[in-house]
């Protein structure tokens, strides 16, 4: 898992992989594009 210099703010986004990320920075750091704002139907990943 990569270490990302992301702010610790909770503004959930749903990634293209169907997972919820705490914020868009974390999603992008994991190589995932943002599908939509807000949570996906599944749990949050940090």
Curated annotation (Swiss-Prot):
UniProt-annotated site: Reactive bond (tryptase), residues: 8-9
GO terms for MF: serine-type endopeptidase inhibitor activity
Domain of life: Eukaryota
Domain Kazal-like: 1-42
Gene3D superfamilies: 3.30.60.30
Family annotation (SUPFAM superfamilies): Kazal-type serine protease inhibitors (SSF100895)
UniProt KW Ion transport keyword: no
UniProt keyword Ribonucleoprotein, yes or no: no
Annotated disulfide bonds: 4-29, 6-25, 14-40
Keywords: Disulfide bond, Protease inhibitor, Serine protease inhibitor
InterPro entries associated with the record: Kazal_dom (IPR002350), Kazal_dom_sf (IPR036058), Serpin (IPR053265)
General function of this protein: Acts as an inhibitor of human tryptase, trypsin and chymotrypsin. Probably acts to block host defense mechanisms.
Official protein name in the record: Leech-derived tryptase inhibitor C
Source organism: Hirudo medicinalis
């Amino acid at each position: 898992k990569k270490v990302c210099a992301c702010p610790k703010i909770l503004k959930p986004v749903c990634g293209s992989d169907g997972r919820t990320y705490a914020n868009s920075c974390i999603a992008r750091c994991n190589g995932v594009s943002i599908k939509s704002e807000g949570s996906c139907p599944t749990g949050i990943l940090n």
